[in-house]
Amino acid sequence: VTDSRDLNDLNAHLLVDPSWVEKHRRNPDIILLDARAKGYAAGHIPGAHWIDVKALKDNTSHTFAAVDALRAVLEKCGVSSGATIVVYDEGNSVLATRLFYVLEYYGLRDQVKLLNGGFAAWTAVGKEVSAEVPDAEEGTLALFAEPLLVVTKEDIQAGLKDSLLLDTRSALEYAGADLRSNRKGGHLPGAIHKEWKEALGAADTDGVVRFKDALTLKREFADAGINPAKTIVPYCQSNQRGAHTYFVLRLIGYPDIRPYEGSWEEWGNDEDTEVTRL
């Protein structure tokens, strides 16, 4: 039996299933965004618009793409300021959670939901698929950056008060054994390691991967020493996996999560950064 007190600070409204999407997708105030890297043209949830998640990042400056460009893309998809946005990807939710985080960073907090299990969950239950690009009445959207939802390299170097650095990469990246394409290997000094994909359950018989239930996630993050009283700073290589953990922490009610947007792409290639290797 679940103690209802355990559920009070969970944000269950952020996660939806295919039946919820089916019920609400024709509502003009609900906008579906397909964040998959490929496959949209072959078939997608009817009414969904494709978003290029790579375009959400300005790689040269290790930060978000310009707000005006994002606003134009979203308005073309029919997003207006009061809309509810439902995001999905193929199923592991790395791309969908990246989109979720960027939308929340730009002021749409609590207006974005994520389809648990993504497109795989939708097709597994035999829901309708469309190859049509939907028409959309252009939206009118106000976006404002929320500085308390991100940290910079300089913030970390200055010493963030009451913070906890959370490395969401693989164990080999954390240890410094896998450098990928970076000049330095290792992790931010003092960072705790908890890999992003530990938040996902095993694939079901249809191959659908969903998030573990919220109470399990809450317990596992607590057991890993991720204290909700602190400012949690997830990071990875480019803040896709870090954004996945941002979403999970939002789901289970952590109040102060500020990903390091530059992540290892910046930290692992700058001259003036300290690293810890195992």
Language-model-derived ranges and their functions:
Residues 2-12, 61, 65-157, 177-178, ...:
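Thiolate-centered catalytic microenvironments shared by cysteine-dependent enzyme domains
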Residues 28-31, 109-111, 162, 231, ...:
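Short active-site oxyanion
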Residues 228, 240-241, 261-264, 269-272:
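Mixed-charge, low-complexity segments
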Residues 229-234, 252, 257, 269-272:
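C-terminal soluble interaction/assembly domains
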Residues 236-238:
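Helix N-cap/beta->alpha junction signal
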